[in-house]
Amino acid sequence: MTDAPLRKSPLFGRFTLQHFVACLLIAYVCYASAIILPAFNADDIIQTQSVSGDYMTFAQQGRWGYFLIYGYLFDANPAGPFALMAGVAILCGAGVVAARTIGASTALSYGSFVLITAVSIYFAICFSFDSTRIAYPLSVAVAALAVHGMLSRRWIAGALLFALAPALFPASVQVGLTIILAASLATLLSERRVAPALRKAVIGAAGVVCGLALYLVLTKLSPFWTGVPLSPRSSVDILGALAEYGRFWKILTGHAVPSGDDISHFNLLMQLSIWALIALLVAVVVSLASSGGGLALTLFAALLAIGLFVTPFCLAFASPIDDFGPRALIAYSITHASIAVLAIETARRWRLSFALVPAVVAGCLVLGTSVAISQNAFDEYLTSRNDFLATNRIMARVEEAAAEAGLSMQGPIPLVVRYEKPFSLASTGVPSTSRATLWSQEWIFRHIDPRIAPITGARREDILRAAGERPEWPRSGSVFVIDGTVVVNIN
């Protein structure tokens, strides 16, 4: 087979608006279940009720950009399907910028990068939290634009812009560093010299450091204009982070090595596709050595390649507080997308037909991921539906108890819930439940009926102690009134 027919193919031509629209439509199809099926997890239950003020915690944690977008721009209203569709579109746009930074030159390279980035199980898990659907994709777009500016000799603009990214989502720092390493490796492969690649890595890293320094200054000043004090979660503790070394092993064996242990519906097609991408990356590095690249060139390429699997969790070295679950590891989608671009661009220098191999692998990864996204969305829908149905059944008893105690049925109706031994309401694989999570036990009742006034803090604990041992729901006496507060004793 000759390359002549492929030279005229639109796959190897310029990436156009038509290609972008096609990628966007494919991404929408992949997220169709998540867009259509409504689901509310424990965070959604409390964050969608502005009276809770829960969005203030974003500012406490140093995510003041996230706080401004969700708390003020959207008034603590997640905006449903619109927000998810807008978020996917922003991710696709960010993918175009990042692919250009890395050195994509054909529609095939751009398309592979955009789809792997946007159709990602990591972002799908983020999107399960409704409040993230605009802010988190924006953080990726800001990081991609900032890195592009830094590596295009617009250092000051890039560093200033990068300071905004962690204010939206701290994991965007990992996204920026991953793009920098991928761009450096692409330069090394194309120019076959260490100096330009090293220069690009150093410039990018310096820009990130400057951007982070500015972010830290702005974050320290943020209480003056947000009115929200910072919490310990916004601090840096490298020694404490290193003491929690078990997290690093868990991430390496679950994500760098694609086992998917802590990801629901991580299927065999996804696993095989990621392993195939890793094999392609090894082949790219080996091809550099076999073509006379020299030991220094090959070792530096290998170092950059390994770095692509470390930068997605590098913030774990800064703080021991977060457990670094899949939501914090969105940069792995950038790693996988970057490998696809590097493999395509390397292969096409040999023969255009060779570039189809990594493109097929990328397509398989997107297909497997779309299945996982749909299955996860369906499970979350079932769990959320069951949560509300169960809460509705209890709500009838709450009204009866309030009426018998002479409480105003116009509201507010103070409420405390005891739910100490949670069990799954999911029909399939999702274990979490909004009814049982500590911070949403009372708020799910208010989500159904705004007359409910959740009791929190010390008063809640006092009431639960006064309640003592009571029958468990749905037995008689499991819903009762103490000091003008309705108490629901689930278990």
Where are these regions (language model features)?
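Specific aromatic-rich, kink-prone transmembrane helix
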Residues: 136-162, 179-189
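Membrane-interface alpha helices of multi-pass inner-membrane proteins
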Residues: 155-171, 175-181, 206, 210
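Perimembrane helix-loop-helix junctions
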Residues: 176-209
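Intrinsically disordered, polar/acidic, low-complexity terminal segments
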Residues: 2-60, 64-65, 70, 74-116, ...
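Juxtamembrane "helix-exit" motif on the non-cytosolic side of transmembrane helices
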Residues: 38-41, 119-129, 216-225, 286-290, ...
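Membrane-interface micro-motifs in multi-pass membrane enzymes
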Residues: 59, 63, 108-151, 167-168, ...
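Membrane-lumen/periplasm interface segments of specific transmembrane helices
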Residues: 200-279, 316
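Hydrophobic, aromatic-rich transmembrane alpha-helices
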Residues: 93-95, 265-298
